[in-house]
Amino acid sequence: DYGIKQLESLIDSGYKIDLNQGMDARLVTDEIAQILSKLKWIRYLRFSCDSTPQIAAIHKTAELLGKYGIKPSKMLIYLLVTSDLANAEYRVEQLKTIRGISIYAQAERNESMGITPNKLQREFAQRYVYSGKFRTLSWTEYARGKGLID
């Protein structure tokens, strides 16, 4: 409730805002979508998609925001790329059905827990998604074309 009140207080402030951490789309209700639509954004409304259950919520959020005039092209989705590349590919394929949405992939890294991205995770995030190849090719098609997988 506190965060929502803070956002509401910014509506007529004249400030352009940027919530640079990915918001949780599962928390976006009709009321929150309406509040988000009234704010002035620097560029994107940023959401995260770290796991498969978040996909449906992102689709619903895009629909709710659309109801209040916010196009999917104003949405950026942070996509966590774990060692399960099939799951990352699935999430990308599901998200790209929201026409106009932007995706920023980040390979999982947590050195204190011994997690560092492997070569394929880095390729997925830095070359496949960042270059926009995901819009026309599946990860499997891209990786086979590059000789990364059989």
What are these regions (language model features)?
Residues 67-70, 78-150:
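Auxiliary Fe-S-binding modules of radical SAM enzymes
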Residues 1-61, 74-81, 102-106:
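Core AdoMet radical
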Residues 64:
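Short, conserved SAM-binding segment of the class I
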